[in-house]
Amino acid sequence: MGRLYVVATPVGNLEDITVRAIKILLSVPVIACEDTRRTGMLIKILKERYSDFLYSHPNPPPKLGGGNQREGVKKYLSVRDWNEAEQVEKVMQLLETDDVALVSDAGTPLLSDPGYKIVREARKRNFEVMSVPGPFAGAAAVSISGLPTNKVMFWGFLPKKWDLEPGLTHVIYESPVRLNKTLKKIEMKYPEAEIVIACELTKIHEKIWKHKNGEDEKVRGEVTVLVNFGRSW
């Protein structure tokens, strides 16, 4: 019987990946991911950069479970929001004999990414589910925002209908195309709110700044919006 490893991957800077994550990803025979090409490229880079180091280390990657392999072809299984329900059973069947790593395109899986149904079913069937923690864009943005951190609400992408509770720092993901529309809605509903925007975290063009009401923002790449009003501190 295999294990399910929920593995965090970098949100931008590859050097943020943990040694343990590298060991797991290079050892498991099966990886459930969003974009198989993107994850395949990540594995290729990890092998090129770290394979020799890891396997010459006094503490090399441990033998995991069924199907453990250093070399050879890995199986990649695409898991998206629209097909996760039908992929659950495939992952469960693979876990009967093999270890499986679950990753997202970037950051910590399940947080605004698919994977919840797989983890839930694996636990229901008594498979061992292991956390391999690491980068999370929402937490990274909060930690450098200067906003209160004692009470934080993570939204991911906002639903169609939403209200923000006072006294919390709200963490919102948004696309560059919809950013200004969302900012205007927040300004109208909560004119006293303090808004901080973080873009391209850990990348070359990383930027974080306080938004001024009424201004249009020109951004690119991944965007995290942080909102606080009625401060808790």
What are these regions (language model features)?
Residues 1-2, 99, 168-233:
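A contiguous loop/helix-start segment that scaffolds small-molecule binding in enzyme catalytic cores
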Residues 1-55, 70-79:
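Glycine-rich, flexible N-terminal cofactor/catalytic loop recognition
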Residues 32-34, 101-107, 111, 170-174:
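Acidic beta-strand-to-loop metal/phosphate-binding motif
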Residues 37-39, 108, 137, 178:
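Alpha-helix capping/helix-boundary segments
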Residues 54, 75-136:
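Glycine/small-residue-rich loop that forms an oxyanion/phosphate-binding "nest" at active or ligand-binding sites
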Residues 55-72, 232:
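Intrinsic disorder/low-complexity segments
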Residues 88-95, 162-166, 214-217:
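Short amphipathic alpha-helix with an adjacent loop that forms part of the alpha/beta core around
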Residues 112-166:
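Class I SAM-dependent methyltransferase SAM-binding "motif I" and its flanking Rossmann-like core
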